[in-house]
């Protein structure tokens, strides 16, 4: 809770600084109307301030205009995303089993999940250990870029349960435009689920930074996202009668067993997935200008019509997965290639993917009813796995 409170205060201060900077720009623009009578040249009195200085910025005068979009991972094609300001189903946005309960999962916030609808399952990545955590990890195509006239902040906090078995999740999103073409922002996500059952807790952290530059001839989008996911493993329950016939277990224990009382195969085992990805896509457009209003023929209003685009996309992924166990493994695993008293399984992967493309744009002429894009992709992959010989890695 202390971390969440500190982050919340930081975001409030950051938003206040951004608003203050825009207020100073407005004052400079206003004072420029007085010619050489700039802010530094004017004689201000600490007690009797100028009447213009006493003007308070009305909330209605703050410009409100927000555009959001995301980009395709392969070619960086922009897709507009209408801003959703409706509270409908907001309470379901934090559920691991999805908005409509279409996912199977292990019962705790952030635990691995799999969609029961086969056609809705995303494609598997090269690092299979993070695929079941689709509720938390944000791929590049789901990062929202913005173009806004005033700083935009979105904070959400979900809480359920008690201090013993409760769940907490705090998310923050902030974006601001430097000018009409350049925008930057970041997102933050912290999840902590204690869980109703033994050895089931989750602690996830994500931080993403993104920026965009969009103009007629050139546009660029960049993302850096870091993830750290730590989850306890229980290996399942020791006796199925806890579920199939709980009355027998109640008779044996002489009390009604609680979820946290159910014995599990593992009690001192966990896994940790840590990694980051860097995504960059940029386009250079060739085209021509024509009158924006073809009927009125207003020569002073021109619009750029792209004809051909040269595209480059880069994605770098680096991930590491640790499986640590201090439970006695001799009675659990059929084949044990590690020490009998502990397990330390570390897997690493590195992927560098480049895509080059040339695109003939749709609609630049009356006969260009469709576009055409050709691309070539090269990907480098490296995997590091533990060897059966202690101390060696392959």
Model-assigned labels for residue ranges:
Residues 148, 179, 214-218, 287-289, ...:
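Outer-membrane beta-barrel channels and translocator barrels
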Residues 168-210, 367-383, 394:
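Surface-exposed extracellular loop regions of Gram-negative outer-membrane beta-barrel proteins
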Residues 157-161, 190-194, 215, 226-230, ...:
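Transmembrane beta-strands of outer-membrane beta-barrel pores
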Residues 126-131, 139-174, 195-196:
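Short strand-turn segments of transmembrane beta-barrel domains in outer membranes
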